[in-house]
């Protein structure tokens, strides 16, 4: 599944927690999390603070 497809699945509520965390780790690693709507950057930082994902 491409990042775009996974983002659409996320926005449609179709991803479970593990898939959501994997998506946000991928978005952070690629830098895309900071270029999308503010929600993505804020959610990424929440996941970092909670220890679910790491900054590259």
How would you name each of these model-derived features?
Residues 1-56:
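Catalytic phosphate/metal-binding cores of nucleic-acid and nucleotide-processing enzymes, i.e., regions
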């Amino acid at each position: 599944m491409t990042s775009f497809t996974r983002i659409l699945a996320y926005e449609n509520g179709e991803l479970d927690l593990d898939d959501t965390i994997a998506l946000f780790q991928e978005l952070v690693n690629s830098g895309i999390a900071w270029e999308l709507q503010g929600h993505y950057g804020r959610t990424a930082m929440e996941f970092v603070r909670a220890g679910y994902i790491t900054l590259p």
